[in-house]
Each structure stands twice: as structure tokens, then as C-alpha cells.
């Protein structure tokens, strides 16, 4: 195993305040890991200072019954879980009592182990600094500030003197025999007393848990729990709901409603006697059960336990005298500080006080070299930071700012001009593109029209050629010159040329039109034939008349064309 370096040992000592041997041992156990060693040291906490005293074998206490060794709450919880029952099915009175009786860190309620006939023996315990008047066989009454497991009237006659010792001199009571062979007081066999014993146990467990929670808020080392208990959230939920159900059941049986803190406060006021034992030990007295007050003996004095107290960084303040003399539970409940009620710390800090939070932050800063930036740093506890008054800027700085602002404005104006120019060019390009598109469409339409016109003309020419071919084929044969009915017609064309042919007087005027058309000088139906003297124009309306009918009877006639 590698030996830890001196720097890790010094850091461990500076954080925990332990000795060199403890630091070396913890670092060797955790293979030189400083964080795990520090966490393990603080997790062990109270268990490192617990010392067990040897069990007196000559204890002459009468044993009525043997109470079996209880199991740990984790084993009970896991056992119930393996059976198949849900965790919250354990929320009954017996489960709550087993949980609080089995926890090694929770204080155990006292058990008066003597029968009723033996309780008349006077018990006197002297201060540890002086000699004791009794032998070592005299039993020590443990934790009589809480309620003892005794049913029925108990009359204890005798004097019990409080023995207050420091934490360094008084070992804790042995756990082995008190857990395995613990003698129980004589109890009644009827069901009513058993039920009262269960209720009394549940009340005591709830009040003890509330008191320990308030004490743990001032000293975080007293509330150190095993790691496996902190990791199991189901156990915490089960214990909380069990306490709540136990308190509600007790309150219903008593016939009134009050909070746990009110019950504890009223019980403290009722428990204070003329001797004011609460002022002697500096602690809040736990409430006594309403089922214990069956005895009317005015000379009865309470048994005071031999109770060790730890020396911690913070302790509970002694109760106020005015509050102890207060008569109403409401005033006592209002006077209890938030630390005693256990509900005065913000939930966002995990239920710890501001002092504990500051210590945790300082510890983390010492370990990691800085204050962590977390969302739960309590800013209200920081001192107010003075704000610096604003100073006027220097003239040079003002001039530089003005120049910079002018440059920025000019730059923005230049950018705007560039944007405008770019937008204008874009608009011009779009306009040109639109014009080109329009011109292209017009050109395409014009070309289409020309093509259609050419196609139409071509078709007309083709049709005209067919008609002219038909007219040429229909022309009668030209007669001979010496024939009596023959007539020669000379026609002057618009281009100045002349065309002549012999026709019969019996031929129709349409035959003359066909002869002119096949010359292909003018188009058909676009002209008229005119005789100059006497002037007479021949049109299409006279095309069916013969030449003789029209007066063209001479051997030779001259005609010309007149365009319509």
C-alpha cells in the first residue's frame, strides 16, 4: 500500500483537526484519496468517540421478561420488501416502535427493571467527585427524563441525586446487554394496558425524534447517519409517515387536536416541579405520559437519570424561566424558537441552519480552493456592498466617443447608400428583364401572325392556281380567222402589255374574264373591262351575257382593264 504524501496529511489535518496518526490511518484506509478519507472521518463522527463501559455481571436486578434483540430498520424494511409488500404497508404503530428502538444512534427510552415491590428501595447516586454511599451493585436509572415503560401507579420513595459528568469521563451505557437481555418491568396482562403502552411508546418516539431534530440543527455532528440510511429515501418516507400516523392516532384517542410541538411544550410545563430539574441538567424535559399519573402521592419525587452530555460546537440554550412559568400551551408554542421546532430552516438548504451551511461552504472552499458557485448561497447574510458613485468621463474620452459615434454614423450611412444602390440596380435589372420578356412575347406573337398570314396566302395562292388551271381548261377553242362569227378582242393590261384572242360572238363575257385571269397579271374579281368609245364598263354582273348581247359585234374590238 502506498504511503500518503505529507501534503495530503497536512490538508487532512487542516480540514478535520485530527492528529497525524488518525490522518495517516484514514488516508491509508482509502488508498490516499483525500476526499473519501475526509468524508469517512466526518461520517463516522460520533461513533469515534463512543466508549462502552463493561457490563456489571453482579447486577442483582430482577428479570421479569427477556426482550428479543431488535433488528435494524434497514433489515426490516428489506425483509418486508422481499416478501412483496409495499414499503408503506409497514406504517403501523409496531413498525414505528421497532424503527426507533432498533436505531443505534437514537436514544433509547428508559426501562424500570424492578418490580413494584422492589421500587421502595431508596436509590441515591452521589456526584462522581465524591464517594458514593451505595455499593457498585446499586442500579443506575437510565433516562428518567423520558417516560418509563411502567403501567399503573408507581410509588418510588427515596432520594435520587443527579450525577452530571462531562463527556470525556462518562462512557455510554453498554448496548449488548441492554438490547439482548433487557429486563422489562412488570406490565398488566389486560388488553387496555397493552394498548396504552403502545400509545405511550409512539408518543415518546415522536417527541424524542422532534427534540433530536432540534438539537441536530445546532450541531451537525450529532445528526450524522450511516451512508446506507441516507441513500435509502424509502426508509425516510416510511419513518416520517409512521410518526405522523402515530401522532394522529394518539391525538384522536385523547380527543383533541394539537401539533407535536404543542404537546411537547405543554408537557414540559406540566413536568416542571418545585425543584425545577430542567434547570439542573440544562435540557428540555420530555413529556410524561398521561397514563403515568395514577398516583396521588404529593411526596413523590421523579427519578433522575445519570445522563451524559456531549461537548459540541453548539448546544441548546436553557429554557426560559418565563416560558416555564407560562400557563397556556399557545404562549409556550409561540415562544419556542425555530431551531427547537425544527422547522425554521429553509427547505432549499436541506433543512440545515445557516451556521451549518456556512461551515459546509468553508469546508468545500478549503478542500477545492474556492467558494462554489451554487444556487443556494444565502445572499441575505452577506453584508451590503456599497455602490461606487459614477464619475463624469474625461474630455478626451468624450471626444473619442463623439468621433467613434460619427464614424459609426458615417459607416451606417455608407452601408445604407450601398444598400440603396444595390436595391436600385436590382429594380433596374427586374425592369429590364420585364421589358425583354414583353418584347419577346410581342415578337413571338408577331412571328406567329406572320406565319399564319403566310400560310393563309399560300393557301390562297394554291387555291387560285387551282382555279386558274380550271379556267384555262374551260376556255373554248379559238376559232379560225375567216370564220363569219369570229371577233378579235385586244386587251391592254395594267402593266401596258396587250393580249388578244379570237372569240365567237356567242361566247359569254365570263370566257373573256377567264382569258384575262389565266394571264396572271391581275387577280380575279379585282378589275373591270372598259370599252373606250362609247364608254361602257363590263363587270361581274354581266359575266353571263354573250358578247353579241353586250354590243361587241365588230370584227375587232379594243378594251382595257380598270382596277376596282
From Swiss-Prot:
Q: Which residues carry this modification: Phosphoserine?
A: 295, 324, 326, 328
* Superkingdom in the source lineage: Eukaryota
Keywords of this entry: Acetylation, Coiled coil, Phosphoprotein, Repeat, Ubl conjugation pathway
Q: What quaternary arrangement does the UniProt entry report?
A: Interacts with RABA5C/ARA-4.
Which residues carry the post-translational modification N-acetylalanine, per the record?
2
What CDD domains does the record tag this protein with?
UBA_Ubx1_like, UBX
Region of interest (Disordered), ranges: 210-229, 267-358, 371-423, 443-483
Q: Name one GO cellular component term.
A: cytosol
Q: What is this protein called?
A: Plant UBX domain-containing protein 8
- UniProt domain UBX: residue ranges: 482-560
**Which GO BP annotation is one of this protein's?**
vesicle-mediated transport
Composition bias, Acidic residues: 291-300
**One Pfam family linked to the record:** UBX
All copies of the UBA-like domain together span 2-44
UIM domain location = 198-217, 230-249
Coiled coil feature spans: 412-478
Record's compositionally biased regions (Pro residues): 381-395
Classification lineage = Eukaryota, Viridiplantae, Streptophyta, Embryophyta, Tracheophyta
Ranges annotated as biased composition (Basic and acidic residues): 322-334, 443-475
